Amino acid sequence: MRFVVRLFPEISIKSAPVRKRWTKMLTDNLRLMAKRIHPTARVNKEWDRIEVTAKVDDPVVEGQLIDMLARTPGIANFSHVQTHPFESLHDIYELVQASWGDQLKGKTFCVRVKRTGNHDFTSTEVERYVGGGLNQNNPTGGVKLKDPDVSIGLEVKDDQVYLVTKKYQGLGGFPMGTQESVLSLISGGYDSTVASFQMIKRGLRTHYCFFNLGGREHELAVKEIAFFLWNRFGSTHRVRFISVPFEGVVGEILQKVGPSNMGVVLKRMMLRAGERIAERGGIEAMVTGEAVAQVSSQTIPNLSVIDSVTDMMVLRPLIVMDKRDIIDISRKIGAEEFSAAVPEYCGVISVKPSAKVNRAKLEAEEEKFDFSILEHALENAVVQSIDEVMDDAQELAEVELVSELPVSAKVIDIRHHTEQELRPLTVEGREVLEIPFYQLSTAYAELDKAVNYYLFCDKGVMSGLHARHLLDAGYTNVGVYRP
């Protein structure tokens, strides 16, 4: 199988050295991910495109490669193509007729051709010859150059013709690793999740900083989201997850700060802490999911007061986006179910928030704050590599792990529905239930308590985490299946 990948247009207009460097980065990223899918996968770079091939005829591998290409930053679009040698225009027509003739009945169509190499014909001549032949020899609805029912794409390159069987939309953006690193202050809600995704899409290596206000379960939920974003969109580059215990900071704010200023002061404390953590990691910018006037702490006056505590750049990719559009992006990238289950803790300390705080009064209240508590939180911050972020042996110690299923046990595939569709799980002689992780806690209550269920995911990380959740909830009939 063969795919032709087109660069995101903003890459194509860069200077020759930059374009060459960024195209190489995208090629390296694709090569790394393609090899994970199949050992025969090859990625070859050319000036205006990248070709991905695999010496295997397997629809599962094909689906995995399509999914990988669709979620890789830096790609405008990509096409599944078939290559054939040719000697004449009529050879090209016959190839197209064999592939497309049966699909044109009663439909309008057009033929689009790109050509490179030395030939005695032009791209337009190929379009006319092939299009005319198709129209004469098939019961079509006629040629229509604008908005046809079927658009047939082909590329003539030297002595080969590339027939496009299907075209796919890419993610856009810049290749991961072409830009600098940023630190995303992630809470797990829609806003910070989508903001993190937008930075990854733009090619920035995005590290995660989580201020824990809600205890262990909140932290594990946010780790799931960060791991999902990294694993799906940025796994070619390692990043870190930093968890900062912020309960003490919140407690101090509740005691020392008036109700109208609490939300803004909390954000100021987060930026102070985030700046310190970023500097430790050599990171030059922080990222937040704030949008103008979405809540009272996010008005222009209040954002100005919040930003005044740091000299570091604070990036806000969602600053003028509507909440509906943010949720739509979350849904599109597969993160909506994660964020919908994460409680928003920042708002609980703002009883009567002010949309325009008095800076002098706020700073006077902040002077009462015991900053040793903030220092203590920073000293106790936990730094983990993102690929190990949920692989905590102590937390998973009580979970039964099996490679062979006990008699009468059933398997629950808890992977995201897109992964279930791409790589269906089959276990000979056993029933496999497909219950995505975000539905598991609700669905598990309805299952037969006399049956033992073993959770499955690709790496055993998510399954171990959710098995632990169920054990904590009082269920004893749960384990992890690692074949």
Swiss-Prot record:
Coiled coil: none annotated. It catalyses: [ThiI sulfur-carrier protein]-S-sulfanyl-L-cysteine + a uridine in tRNA + 2 reduced [2Fe-2S]-[ferredoxin] + ATP + H(+) = [ThiI sulfur-carrier protein]-L-cysteine + a 4-thiouridine in tRNA + 2 oxidized [2Fe-2S]-[ferredoxin] + AMP + diphosphate; [ThiS sulfur-carrier protein]-C-terminal Gly-Gly-AMP + S-sulfanyl-L-cysteinyl-[cysteine desulfurase] + AH2 = [ThiS sulfur-carrier protein]-C-terminal-Gly-aminoethanethioate + L-cysteinyl-[cysteine desulfurase] + A + AMP + 2 H(+). Disulfide bonds join 346-457. ATP binds at residues 185-186, 267, 289, 298. Residues 405-483 form the Rhodanese domain. The active site is at residue 457. Residues 63-167 form the THUMP domain. GO terms for molecular function: ATP binding; CCA tRNA nucleotidyltransferase activity; tRNA binding; tRNA-uracil-4 sulfurtransferase activity. Keywords: ATP-binding, Cytoplasm, Disulfide bond, Nucleotide-binding, Redox-active center, RNA-binding, Thiamine biosynthesis, Transferase, tRNA-binding. It is found in: Cytoplasm. Its EC number is 2.8.1.4. GO terms for cellular component: cytosol. One of its GO terms (biological process) is thiamine biosynthetic process. Belongs to the ThiI family. Catalyzes the ATP-dependent transfer of a sulfur to tRNA to produce 4-thiouridine in position 8 of tRNAs, which functions as a near-UV photosensor. Also catalyzes the transfer of sulfur to the sulfur carrier protein ThiS, forming ThiS-thiocarboxylate. This is a step in the synthesis of thiazole, in the thiamine biosynthesis pathway. The sulfur is donated as persulfide by IscS. This is tRNA sulfurtransferase. It comes from Saccharophagus degradans (strain 2-40 / ATCC 43961 / DSM 17024).
